[in-house]
Amino acid sequence: GRFVDDYRHAWRIVEMADRPNLGTCLDSFHILSRGHDPSAIEDIPGEKIFFLQLADAPALDMDVLSWSRHHRLFPGEGSFDLTAFLGHVLRAGYAGPLSLEVFNDTFRQTDVVRTAAHARRSLTWLADRTAEAAGWSTDRLTAAAAPLAADFVEFKGENLGP
């Protein structure tokens, strides 16, 4: 934000206002891109976290505004530790809605059905990793559906030539 760019500062404002209808929105990109320690999220009562926005991003050395508007990724595709971030949020007691706030030039040009499937896979991945890290049973999570088809296959590696 222009005047408040640290979630801890935002939380202090909410505390001082002491209003039942005022809370905070946590945005993983804004917290992690600025290098803020997310552990203090656990000091915010879950009922005072009103919304959660998630995005991953590659480690880039550039202006945060440009980075934010053009290079966000789905969870698990960047360098942010979203598993730890989400763990802090859940330990705070948050059980409300979340959104993927992924601003990315490539996704803007991609078929929306493919992008939605990609988003769902990333959330399933994040739920699985977060449950494993917390030692929770993954039995309570919906099992992954068997694939019906493949739209594309992507390989990454070195020396893939003949």
Indicate residue ranges for each PLM-predicted region.
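Conserved anion-binding
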Residues: G1
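Histidine-acidic metal/acid-base catalytic patches
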Residues: V4-L26, L32-P162
